Design a protein with these regions (language model features):
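Beta-propeller domains
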Residues: 1-746
Length: 746
C-alpha cells in the first residue's frame, strides 16, 4: 500500500505543498494508568540516518494540533487516520485539540511520545450526538463546530501557557484557543481537568450566539478569548481577555438570512420531522395571543441587543490559580466600550502594563455562520463570499492598560490607544519597561490572511491540480513580503502613547550587509527570501536581562497550490505593498522555500542612533517540498545554549513515515541543518500549531476544580427534557459511545 513520493515527479517542484498535512491520526498513546482510553503504549520514536540524539536534550516538549472531529472522513484501510478538511469547506484549525508530549528525560531509553485529545464536556456531547442523537448533532461551520440546539464546541487546539505558582512544586499547564475558555491539563496524564472560571463568569461573544430568540440559552455558548494568555511568575498572576461585539454590520447578515430562506423553501418542498416533539397545545385563543405578543417583544429585544453598539466589550481577566477569576471592563477615555473588529489572538504583559491588540486573525460573522457544505449552495456561496469578505485591517491597533488600575474595588479601567502601521497576528513584549518604555516585537503578516483558507469553491470543476489533491482547509499563502518589527512605546504621558522608536527588517534593502538575506530575483529585483509568512515562534524563557535577545521564527514561504485568485484580488491594492502584486504572483509560481531563522534584537545601548537593532543572524532553508513548523526552544542540560525542536512535513501520508518528522537543531547553528530526525510509522500529525517546554512533569496536585454538573446545570435546567436527560446520560459522566450499538443507557 505504501509508496515513496520520491518517485512521483509531481511532488518535486517547489510549489507543491506537502500533502501529508491533509491527514492526521486520532489515536491516543499513553500508559493505561494515566489514560484508560489510550489505544497503545507511549510511542518510542526512531532516529533517522543512524545519527545520535544530542546528549543535552532534556525535559518535555508539548505540541498541539487540530486533529479532526468525531465525524471526519477516515481512510479506507485505517479508520484511525482521518482527513479533516476533505469536505472542501472546513479549515484545518477546526478540530479537536490533540496534545503531543515528547519526553526527553531518559535519553538512554529513547524519546517517547504520549498523546491525548483535549476532551471538554462539549467533546462528549459531540461524540454522543454523532452516534446516538443525530437531531442534536454538531456540524462544522467555518472555524466553528456548532449544534443548533447545544451551541458551540470549545476545541482547545491552539496554544499552551505554563504557570509556576510560588506555593507549588510543579508547573501547571493551560491549553487554549481563541473561542473557548482555557482549560488546565494534567502534565502527566494529559487529561483536560478543569476550565478557568465558571461558565457564568464568561460573557458570550454576542447575545445571539448565547441564546437565539424564542429558544432557551445554549448550554455551550461562544466565548471569545485569547489563544495566548500571559503569566507573571513574579506576581503569580495569569492574564487573559474576554471580548465580544455587536452584529451591527447589515451586510454580514446577508448570508444567514439567505440560507435561512433557502432552508425554509427546502422544508416546504420536502417536509420532514425535525427537532423536539411538542406536546398538544391546550391554550385558548387569548393565551395564544398573549404568548405571541410576548414572543414578538422578546424577538425584537434580542435583535436590538445583538445589534446594539454597547454589545462591544473587552474584559481583562486575572487569575491566581486557586480563587475565582477577577475581571475589569476596558473602555476608551470617554467611557465608550472598546470594539475589537477582528480578534485578540495574542496579548502581552510587562511588569507594569497589559498590552491588548486587535490582531490580524479576523473573526467575522460570515465565517461564524457560513453556508452549508452542500453542492446546491456552491454558486450562491461563492457569490456571497466575494460580496461580503473583506481584507484584514492593514494596521495594528494596540490598547495599553496600566496594571495598577486593576484594583479589586473597580469594575472598569481605561485604556490608551496607539496604532502601528502594518498588521500583526503574533507579538511578544519585553517584561521590563524601564521609564515606562514598552518594547514590542511584532511579526507583520503583510497581506497574509491566515483567517482565509483553501475551499472547494476557489477552483473550477475543470481544475484537476495536476492530479494532486487540492489543499482544502489550508491557510492561503502570503501575498507580499512580511516585515519583522521592534517598537518602543513611550507610556509616560497619562493621555497618549507614542512610538518612541521603530525598527523593521524584511526587505532586502534593509539588510544588505546581512548574508542571511540573500537575493530572490524577479525581473532583476532582489527581495529577502526568508521573511515570507512568519508563522510561529520560539525563544528562551525568562532572559535575565528582562528583554528578548533572540527570537526564532518559522516561515511559510510561497507555494503555488495555496495561492487563490480571490485572495490575490482582495489584497492586490494592499496599503503597504512592498513588492508589486504581479511580481508576487511570479514569485509564488516559482516558489519560495519554507525556513527557520534566528532574529537577533540588539541592546539599544550597543547601537548608534540610527542603527537597525534587528538582524537575521542564522537561518536554515528547508529542501524543496519540505515545510517546517512549530519550533520550540529546549535549553541544553548542564550548559549554555540549547536546541530547536520542530515538526517537518514532506510528501504524502502514503510514505512509510507518513511524511511527518521531528527535527532537532542546534539553536546556535541553524544553518548547519538538523542534528537528528525522529520518526515512526504511527506518527501522523495534522498541521501543528503552538508549543511549550517543561523541565519536568507530574501528577496534578492543585485543588482548583470546577465540577462539570455544577458548571452547566444553571443552563441545562432551562432546556427541554431530552437535553436534560442527554447531559445526565453522556456529558456529566464523561461517557463516550464507541459505536451506535453503545447508545443504550445501563
Amino acid at each position: 500500500m505504501n509508496k515513496s513520493v520520491e518517485k512521483d515527479d509531481k511532488l518535486e517542484k517547489n510549489s507543491s505543498f506537502p500533502r501529508s498535512v491533509l491527514s492526521v491520526s486520532r489515536v491516543e498513546f499513553g500508559l493505561r494508568e494515566d489514560n484508560p482510553e489510550a489505544k497503545y503504549c507511549p510511542l518510542k520514536l526512531l532516529v533517522k540516518d543512524g545519527k545520535q540524539l544530542p546528549s543535552g536534550l532534556q525535559g518535555h516538549v508539548f505540541i498541539i494540533s487540530a486533529t479532526g472531529s468525531v465525524d471526519s472522513k477516515s481512510r479506507d484501510d485505517n479508520k484511525d487516520i482521518v482527513f479533516p478538511s476533505s469536505d472542501g469547506f472546513t479549515p484545518f484549525y477546526n478540530g479537536d485539540g490533540m496534545v503531543y508530549r515528547f519526553d526527553f528525560d531518559n535519553l538512554e531509553e529513547g524519546v517517547f511520545l504520549t498523546t491525548r485529545i483535549a476532551k471538554t464536556p462539549c467533546y462528549y456531547a459531540d461524540a454522543a450526538t454523532n452516534k446516538c442523537q443525530p437531531n442534536l448533532r454538531f456540524k462544522n461551520r467555518g472555524i466553528m463546530r456548532m449544534s443548533d440546539e447545544l451551541g458551540i464546541r470549545n476545541q482547545l487546539n491552539t496554544g499552551f501557557l505554563p504557570m509556576k505558582f510560588s506555593q507549588e512544586d510543579n508547573e501547571r499547564l493551560l491549553i487554549t484557543w481563541d473561542i473557548g475558555r482555557p482549560y488546565e491539563i494534567d502534565t502527566k496524564t494529559l487529561e483536560a481537568v478543569t476550565p478557568v472560571g465558571w461558565d457564568r463568569d464568561w460573557r458570550a461573544f454576542n447575545p445571539l450566539l448565547a441564546k437565539l430568540p424564542l429558544q432557551p440559552p445554549f448550554p455551550f455558548k461562544l466565548v471569545q478569548t485569547s489563544a495566548h494568555p500571559c503569566f507573571d511568575e513574579n506576581t503569580g498572576e495569569m492574564f487573559t481577555v474576554n471580548s465580544g461585539r455587536s452584529l451591527s454590520t447589515f451586510i454580514a447578515q446577508l448570508r444567514p438570512v439567505l440560507y435561512w430562506a433557502f432552508g425554509l423553501i427546502d422544508s416546504i418542498r420536502n417536509p420532514s420531522p425535525r427537532g423536539f416533539q411538542k406536546a398538544p397545545d391546550q391554550k385558548n385563543f387569548f393565551q395564544k395571543l398573549a404568548a405571541a405578543f410576548k414572543q414578538t417583544i422578546h424577538l425584537l429585544w434580542s435583535l436590538l441587543q445583538s445589534f446594539n453598539i454597547f454589545a462591544n466589550f473587552v474584559y481583562v481577566i486575572s487569575w491566581d490559580g486557586k480563587e475565582k477569576i477577577n475581571k475589569w471592563q476596558v473602555t476608551h477615555p470617554n467611557g465608550c466600550p472598546i470594539a475589537i473588529k477582528q480578534s485578540m489572538h495574542q496579548i502581552g504583559l510587562t511588569e507594569d502594563y497589559v498590552v491588548l491588540m486587535d490582531t490580524a486573525f479576523k473573526f467575522l460573522l460570515e465565517e461564524i455562520l457560513p453556508a452549508p457544505n452542500e453542492p446546491k449552495y456552491e454558486e450562491i456561496e461563492k457569490w456571497l463570499s466575494n460580496l461580503i469578505d473583506r481584507p484584514q485591517l492593514p494596521d495594528s491597533t494596540i490598547y495599553i492598560v496600566r496594571r495598577t488600575d486593576l484594583k479589586s474595588d473597580v469594575k472598569k479601567v481605561v485604556a490608551r490607544q496607539v496604532v502601528i502601521p502594518r498588521e500583526t497576528t503574533h507579538f511578544l513584549t519585553d517584561y521590563k519597561n524601564p521609564n515606562d518604555q514598552i518594547t514590542l516585537h511584532l511579526a507583520h503578516v503583510c497581506a497574509w490572511d491566515v483567517a482565509e483558507w483553501i475551499r472547494e469553491i476557489d477552483f473550477s470543476n475543470s481544475d484537476n491540480n495536476g492530479g494532486l489533491p487540492h489543499m482544502f482547509g489550508m491557510t492561503v499563502g502570503p501575498l507580499d513580503i512580511s516585515r519583522m518589527g521592534c517598537y518602543v512605546l513611550d507610556a509616560k504621558d497619562a493621555k497618549q502613547i507614542k512610538v518612541a522608536r521603530s525598527d523593521l527588517t524584511g526587505v532586502y534593502a534593509d539588510n544588505q550587509p546581512n548574508k542571511y538575506c540573500q537575493d530572490t530575483q524577479t525581473n532583476g529585483k532582489e527581495y529577502c527570501k526568508y521573511t515570507w509568512g512568519p508563522a510561529l515562534y520560539a525563544y528562551r524563557e525568562n532572559p535575565p536581562s528582562g528583554h528578548f535577545e533572540n527570537i526564532y521564527w518559522s516561515f511559510f514561504g510561497c507555494w503555488e497550490d495555496i495561492f487563490t485568485e480571490e485572495g490575490f484580488q482582495m489584497y492586490q491594492n494592499y496599503k503597504y505593498r512592498a513588492i508589486p502584486a504581479d511580481e508576487v504572483r511570479q514569485l509564488t509560481k516559482k516558489g519560495i522555500k519554507s525556513n527557520l531563522l534566528r532574529l537577533h534584537i540588539a541592546d539599544l545601548d550597543t547601537l548608534e542612533a540610527n542603527e537597525n537593532r534587528l538582524q537575521i543572524q542564522d537561518a536554515y532553508e528547508f529542501d524543496t517540498g519540505y515545510f517546517g513548523n512549530s519550533p520550540q526552544f529546549v535549553p541544553r542540560a548542564g550548559g549554555t545554549g540549547g536546541y530547536i525542536v520542530c515538526v517537518v512535513y514532506n510528501g504524502t501520508d502514503e510514505q512509510p513515515d507518513n511524511g511527518n518528522e521531528i527535527w532537532i537543531f542546534d539553536a546556535a547553528d541553524l544553518k548547519s541543518g538538523p542534528l537528528c530526525k525522529l520518526w515512526h510509522p504511527q506518527l501522523n500529525f495534522g498541521i501543528s500549531v503552538h508549543t511549550t517546554w517543561l523541565s519536568k512533569i507530574g501528577k496534578r496536585t492543585a485543588s482548583y476544580n470546577i465540577p462539570v454538573k455544577q458548571d452547566y446545570e444553571y443552563l441545562v435546567k432551562q432546556q427541554p427534557q431530552e437535553i436534560q436527560e442527554f447531559f445526565n446520560e453522556w456529558v456529566y459522566p464523561k461517557r463516550e459511545p464507541k459505536d451506535s450499538g453503545d447508545c443504550s443507557v445501563s
